[in-house]
Amino acid sequence: MNFQPIDGKKLLAWLQPVLSDIKGKITPNVEMRKVTWFRTGGLAELFYQPADEDDLALFFKVLPEFVPVTIVGIGSNLLVRDGGIPGVVIRLSTKSFGQIKQVSSTRFLVGAATADKHLASAALEAEISGFHFYHGIPGGLGGALKMNAGANGVETAERVVEVYALDRKGERHILNLRDMNYAYRHCNIPEGLVFTAALLEGDVGNKDDIRAAMHEVALHRETVQPIREKTGGSTFRNLEDISAWKVIDEAGCRGLQIGGAQMSEMHCNFMINMGEATGYDLEKLGETVRARVFNHSAHHLEWEIQRIGQFEQDRIVLPFDQFH
């Protein structure tokens, strides 16, 4: 694993001639700990917020293909490693990609930067049912589309009609539900696509029923999840026949702590930053839990939290099955 020094000012100066027509904001050396809900992570070499979809398309057309690109949302399900992220990190702004437009009695056109909870609220006002579960998902639509986010027995795949995206060449794509190849907490699409919006469909409902369903979702989160901590949400995907938290608990990992990172006492499938955790602490804790669960019950936990960026030199976390 080669460590690449982060020098955003140098990269920006080198790219400046091809970026002259870009209207969005490009910032060198952005601290990713200010972006992620874990409040950890190294520097993004360049941090780009496109002005609109045309600006993003142009950016892709002029950016040399060998410059790495990483897409981030609102940072809720994201662990950024301490060595930072080489190349360009792209984050869609809510101003340009956060629209919610009702296009029929049961359909919304929704920007990828829209907060999931705002979509739930819009559906309540429009009396469209089937979106209440987004009230309990601490993320944005782009991440929900990619991860097939769900709660309370409902998944994003059940609401998707079309998804709109751009590729690394700046070409536009429209993907239908079949194209998304959805599975549990996953979609299988071509590498490099960036979601910009989606057409979603619910059902005709009424405010009282929708409000009651949203209240139930909120009450559940409040009761069983450490929502006031610095956390990234569910750490591992549930297994086919058993919840991840159960095998974690049975392996004795509830409350397990490494450095400033801890498996929550309240919900042991949630990692929390106790105050000064590093990305290394969090990822080391996660891999330690995976190893202990495997040793205890032979269950193989898969990460649900997205881990991106590079490790600091001499502070590398190997997947547990490489040191098991």
From Swiss-Prot:
PROSITE patterns: FAD_PCMH. The keyword Flavoprotein applies. It comes from the Bacteria. It catalyses: UDP-N-acetyl-alpha-D-muramate + NADP(+) = UDP-N-acetyl-3-O-(1-carboxyvinyl)-alpha-D-glucosamine + NADPH + H(+). Its main location: cytoplasm. It is an enzyme of class 1 (oxidoreductase). Its EC number is 1.3.1.98. GO terms for biological process: cell division; cell wall organization; peptidoglycan biosynthetic process; regulation of cell shape. It is found in: Cytoplasm. Keywords: Cell cycle, Cell division, Cell shape, Cell wall biogenesis/degradation, Cytoplasm, FAD, Flavoprotein, NADP, Oxidoreductase, Peptidoglycan synthesis. Residues 39-220 form the FAD-binding PCMH-type domain. Coiled coil: none annotated. Cell wall formation. This is UDP-N-acetylenolpyruvoylglucosamine reductase. It comes from Bartonella bacilliformis (strain ATCC 35685 / KC583 / Herrer 020/F12,63). The gene is murB.
